[in-house]
Amino acid sequence: MTPEFFPENINVISTKRYNQEKPKVFSNGFDSFNIADHVGDDPERVSGNRKKLVQYLNLTSEPRYLNQIHSDKCLRFSSIECEGDALYTNKKNEVCAILTADCLPIFITDTLGQEAAVIHAGWRGILQGVIEETLKSFVSKKLVAHFGPAISKENFQVGSEVRDQYLSKDKSFNSAFKTISSKNYLDLYHAARLILNRHDIYKISGGTQCTFRQKDEYFSYRRDGKYSGRMANLIWIG
């Protein structure tokens, strides 16, 4: 798919929790199209799912996956490092991938379609600056963004210490929180939008899905706990 505002040569996809070739069977989070190999699922099934993804998308190369650590690290596709939470490329057919269940996947490209990146933006990563660090990788300053599926504010309760950390970093994050009966709820979409806007990125699509609420479509760690699989979020330059 090509999101709104994105050049036609930029390819973006977020997988769902089921393989459309099979019935939806949800006795646990792993009886479906899980792409993560670190959550306790059968390694052979995960490997098979990854191969099906490559075949379905007719990719010429394997996606590059990271060992995600909720950090601010953005790696170039060619980097020998394996730990990080964002991938950047400026070459064709280098498929950058991050895995999510509730965290926010952010896709970024320039208006000419010569650079691309995908970010794993959970509350920790956003707080640590993973979005800002990824933007530093881009040569172009004319950028657009797309939000993949993440947990919605209504279903993402966080502790008061999380809110305090955000407000200590920037008071404007107050608008990303809602407090109901002394309970704090964080809007990841809004928090990310604030950061992107501060870097003159206003053309942003997506941000309407909820991984927690849309059980038939998405994995959710907050909803399913340790039996939650992960969706793959891919971007590449065609």
For the regions a protein language model found, what residue spans apply to each?
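Active-site microenvironment for binding and transforming phosphate-containing groups
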Residues: M1-G238
